[in-house]
Curated annotation (Swiss-Prot):
Entries under PANTHER family matching the protein: PTHR45839, SUCROSE SYNTHASE 1
EC number of this enzyme: 2.4.1.13
Name listed for the protein in its UniProt record: Sucrose synthase
Signal peptide: none
Keyword ATP-binding in record: no
Keywords assigned by UniProt, alphabetized: Glycosyltransferase, Transferase
Length: 793
């Protein structure tokens, strides 16, 4: 395959330049990959040639007078830009800044001289980065090697860093690792040897309490382990780090330090609660993710503290917004204990009032921005009151939560972790370039700025998949989309992120095994819940929240469940079903999504999708073949819903235009349902195509319908086809996706990046000043404009 543009132009000279001339004559001055491929095929060029393979690598073209500008994806996380003269047949590589200026020339030429240029590359050049593509998302492994090598090359400095770091940790003034009897690193070395000699006289299972006076006399406290064996192991690791540093020893020792007791998890938008919230505006998988995450983290913290010899109860607080008019939920209660947890809580802090007609109600995640600075300020005080001290770790979620995490971590001076869940920039075509036209709906000027601030301020970033960071050979990753972009008249980003940076780590979540489990486990299933869901789905009983009935409820159910918005793309599945006689003959469509009455929602995207759903059901005459359920299913009922569909040998379809990860995909698979899910986003890595599920193209209706029809047809002929895929789906989730593994890894990351932050704190002052400037001059000025609009409502 020819990847090099110069060789491509040489090998396919006539076709190459003829095609680019065809591009330059199109009405659209900006074209993307799919449009270029369609033009290539429509123009009669050979799809089997090396030229076609090169065209697939072009992400975008800009047509100007007598030239075409190309954005070419050389490989994963590597892009080059070219200007091609169609008069002189010249190819010239250009910079990202030049490419962005060309885009501005087409989109908004009057802003060329007023657009601020941002460039984070000088800061990234000072930081460690992985070199090989396959290690993207494994930042901590490279960081461990980097830190251990630094301990060799700058021995005295890093020994002191390590010594000061472990002396730092205490609980309520009581030292956890070292006490003041140990004065410096040389003394520490001697005392380790003395302690190891003393410990050698005691059996490995000797409790700490029996030997604590010996250890304390030597300068060691109880946080090194619960018994002589654990303490001996950890002291040997510390001895190795001081004398012969090794990346494995560094990771294991730092991970064993009891340095995290209090965690703040930030998620302001939507209705964050435990009951009756899923399906409300801006409320979905993120809430499920965080609640499951909290329980797993708390359990792991308790276990690790016990192993360290500490009988302490950690505390986790999920910080969210208090909504006065909470629509019958608990979202107007200040404090709520998390079910099944020992000391984990939801803390709700209200937005400051300003205009009560706005701030007493739910506020869209796209309009939340003017209130977040005050929210962070008030939350700082509230968190201090609850924890009685600063938290040890702050985890931000989504753009708004990550912005608040940035503000809080800066004020608390603690480790900041970011979890994007989904970055809106990659969902909406040209959302940055035409930001001004979209501003009244989405306010991307603030959201993309918040993302830039969060990405570049976080000590480490958690992603659920590789593609979330760096995409694929053919498509750009969510984070990668922040490398180069322009918002004409506001700012252009010449270099916004480095996907190779060590802050990126892939840590995939799991599912709540008490709620989502395989359908054959009948003893675990509640008969009343099963009866209720079967009645809702298949009985044709009248319900004001349900559209449609099933003439033949025994047909194979095709099931989908999600929020009802443009990105979730439920209407695509309805079209597939509505235009396929084969599917309608053999199957029914069961949709659990949103509301069925547009007057029952304030979300304008949901309103549009509700209208579209009604239009499609009427157009395709589906009223007797569909059950569209427009109400919330509690978590226990959603788990049973998957199992009931599996019991009837149905399938689950997730047709999103883009899915950051895909919790519903995991939930369906672990229930034993064959899954057809979007190939854009997390499901591309969750599902092994054809082995334990199927990838679908959410814009290719014919191909998607054909895949579903073929699988259902094969399953009717041979029941083992369905059985095999069902078992493989369960196996995939069981082996790969676990909250236990997730929580253990996240806490280990938090400790290692905490050490790195401590050891290199002064080196971050320059980027922090840059971020502060962006926040105050760009973000706050845009937020002020939106607040003024809200005050007029």
């Amino acid at each position: 395959m020819i990847k090099d543009i110069y060789k491509t132009a040489e090998t396919f000279h006539n076709d190459f330049y003829d095609f680019l001339k065809a591009v330059s004559t199109q009405p659209k001055k900006l074209m993307i990959t799919g449009e270029l491929i369609n033009l290539y095929v429509a123009s009669g060029y050979d799809k089997n040639s090396g030229l076609y393979e090169f065209i697939e690598k072009i992400q975008e073209t800009i047509s100007l007078d007598h030239s075409v500008i190309l954005d070419v994806r050389i490989k994963i996380a590597s892009i080059k830009f070219y200007r091609i003269s169609l008069e002189e047949f010249l190819i010239e590589e250009i910079s990202s800044k030049e490419f962005l200026i060309y885009k501005e020339t087409v989109a908004k030429p009057d802003t060329l001289n007023t657009t601020l240029n941002l460039n984070f590359k000088p800061f990234y050049d000072k930081s460690p980065a992985v070199r090989d593509i396959k290690y993207i998302g494994s930042g901590v492994e490279y960081l461990n090697r980097f830190l251990s090598s630094q301990m060799f090359t700058n021995e005295e400095r890093w020994k002191k860093n390590l010594f000061d770091f472990i002396r730092l940790h205490n609980f309520n003034g009581e030292q956890l690792i070292l006490n003041d009897r140990i004065k410096d690193t040389k003394h520490l070395n001697n005392q380790i040897n003395a302690a190891l000699a003393k410990l050698g006289n005691h059996p490995a299972n000797t409790p700490y309490e029996n030997i604590k006076h010996i250890l304390q006399e030597l300068g060691f406290e109880k946080g090194l382990g619960k018994d002589a064996g654990t303490i001996t192991h950890n002291l040997n690791l510390l001895d190795q780090l001081l004398n012969s540093p090794d990346h494995n020893a560094l990771a294991e020792f730092i991970s064993s330090i009891p340095m995290i007791l209090n965690i703040a998890i930030i998620s302001p938008h939507g209705f964050f609660g435990q009951e009756g919230v899923l399906g409300l505006p801006d409320t979905g998988g993120q809430v499920v993710y965080i609640l499951d995450q909290v329980k797993a983290l708390e359990k792991q913290l308790i276990d690790s503290l016990k192993k360290s010899g500490l009988n302490l109860l950690p505390k986790i607080i999920v910080l969210t917004r208090l909504i006065p008019n909470a629509r019958g939920t608990t979202c107007n209660q200040r404090l709520e204990k998390i079910y099944g947890a020992k000391n984990s809580w939801i803390l709700r802090v209200p937005f400051r009032e300003y205009n009560k007609r706005v701030t007493d109600e739910w506020i869209s995640r796209f309009e939340i921005w003017p209130y977040l600075e005050d929210f962070a300020e008030d939350s700082y005080t509230a968190l201090l009151a609850e924890f009685k001290k600063r938290p040890d770790l702050i985890i931000g979620n989504y753009s708004d939560g990550n912005l608040v995490a940035y503000l809080l971590a800066k004020k608390f001076k603690v480790t900041q972790c970011g979890i994007a869940h989904a970055l809106e920039k990659s969902k909406y075509l040209y959302s940055a370039l035409y930001w001004y036209d979209l501003e009244k709906y989405y306010h991307f000027s603030m959201q993309f700025t918040a993302d830039l601030l969060a990405i570049n301020s976080a000590d480490f970033l958690i992603t659920s998949s590789f593609q979330e960071i760096a995409g694929t050979e053919k498509s750009i990753g969510q984070y990668e989309s922040y490398m180069h972009f322009t918002m004409p008249g506001l700012y252009r980003v010449e270099n916004g992120v480095n996907p190779f940076h060590v802050k990126f780590n892939i840590v995939s979540p799991g599912v709540n095994e008490k709620i989502y489990f395989p359908y054959p486990k009948t003893k675990w299933r509640l008969k009343e819940t099963k009866r209720r869901i079967e009645n809702l789905f298949f009985s044709n009983s009248e319900d004001p929240d349900v559209i449609g009935w099933l003439d033949n409820p025994e047909k194979t159910p095709i099931f989908t469940m999600s929020r009802l918005d443009r990105i979730k793309n439920i209407s695509f599945l309805v079209r597939c079903f509505g235009e396929s006689e084969e599917l309608q003959q053999t199957s029914n469509l069961i949709v659990v999504a949103g509301k069925i009455d547009e007057t029952m929602t304030d979300d304008y995207e949901e309103k549009e999708q509700i209208r579209l759903m009604h239009e499609l059901i009427t157009k395709y005459k589906l009223h007797n073949k569909i059950r569209w359920i427009g109400k919330l299913l509690p978590k226990d009922e959603s788990g049973e819903a998957y199992r009931i569909i599996a019991e009837r040998r149905g399938i689950f379809v997730q047709p999103a235009l883009f899915e950051g990860f895909g919790l519903t995909v995991l939930e369906a698979m672990t229930s034993g349902l064959p899954v057809f899910a979007t190939k854009y986003g997390g499901p591309l890595e969750i599902i092994q195509n054809g082995v334990n599920g199927f990838h679908i193209d959410p814009v290719n209706q014919e191909e998607t319908t054909e895949k579903i029809v073929r699988f259902l047809s094969d399953s009717y002929i041979d029941s083992s086809v369905w059985d095999k895929l069902s078992k493989a789906a369960i196996k995939r989730v069981t082996e790969k996706y676990s909250w236990k593994l997730y929580s253990k890894r996240l806490l280990s990351l938090a400790k290692l990046y905490g050490f790195w932050k401590y050891a290199t704190n002064l080196e971050h002052e320059d980027i922090n000043a840059y971020l502060d400037l962006i926040y105050h001059t760009i973000y706050k000025s845009r937020a002020k404009i939106l607040l003024e609009e809200h005050m007029k409502r």
